């Protein structure tokens, strides 16, 4: 048996709140959880993600250490 009076209170219907709106309910030790970003408004999950870095990391590494010429079309 678990020891009495050492465990935090459990809230099986804790509300997750984003921008003043309840977005889901979960089990937690807090009655309300305020978040700024959740899967419903995160760019990765909504499909509005923007690609900022158009240069590949490998190409940048190879060029930085002189293993790739400036014209990478010859090697592709």
Curated annotation (Swiss-Prot):
SUPFAM superfamilies: L28p-like. Part of the 50S ribosomal subunit. This is Large ribosomal subunit protein bL31. One of its GO terms (cellular component) is ribonucleoprotein complex. Gene3D superfamilies: Ribosomal protein L31 (4.10.830.30). Belongs to the bacterial ribosomal protein bL31 family. Type A subfamily. PROSITE patterns: RIBOSOMAL_L31 (PS01143). Keywords: Ribonucleoprotein, Ribosomal protein, RNA-binding, rRNA-binding. The gene is rpmE. The keyword Hydrolase does not apply.
